[in-house]
Amino acid sequence: MNRKNTGLYRLLGAISLCLFSVGICAETSIAILDFELSDVTLAPGIPAEIARTASIKAMLEGELKGAGYKIVTVDLAAQREANGGFGYLFNHNDVAAELANKAGADYVLVGRLHKPSFLFAYLMGHLIKTHDGGLIENYVVETKGGDKKLTLKAVETLASKIDKNLDNIYTPPPPIRTLHTK
């Protein structure tokens, strides 16, 4: 009888381990909506700033995908249809959550590049649970100037902040050092 119990315990232990392993291996899925530009400088709508804003989504997807997150694509036409105007999805977590939930994402990030000055801008984002529309965190990352390297650094910082609220698996790349020769 003792041997039967030992075998049963081993079997239950193996099943538990398998179920636990499946839970650990499940990827956290996140949808990242297109970032919108809130340019309140004296010369809004500069093509370079529009291009920079458009590049943020792809950079952030690359950082999070490299860390092991599953990136879910939301149909652009569906995103435009759900967006009632500038700032609508950013201010309506429930609508953004429903949009990403239909695409199969666990979470959605709604982002904005807020540019109050030519000297700096703020990368802003709302991380939302798609199953209930609950706001997990509101992020703000400052970036100086419009240089692509500085924008990427801000995106890396944003990815790190998002990851701290989710799986804590992201490791940002080390800073690039340049050697000065005499």
Name what the model sees in each region:
Residues 41-51, 83-87:
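Second-shell loop/turn segments in exported
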Residues 45-47, 123-126:
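Short, glycine/charged-enriched secondary-structure capping and boundary segments
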Residues 67-110:
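Short, solvent-exposed, polar/charged sequence segments at loop or secondary-structure edges
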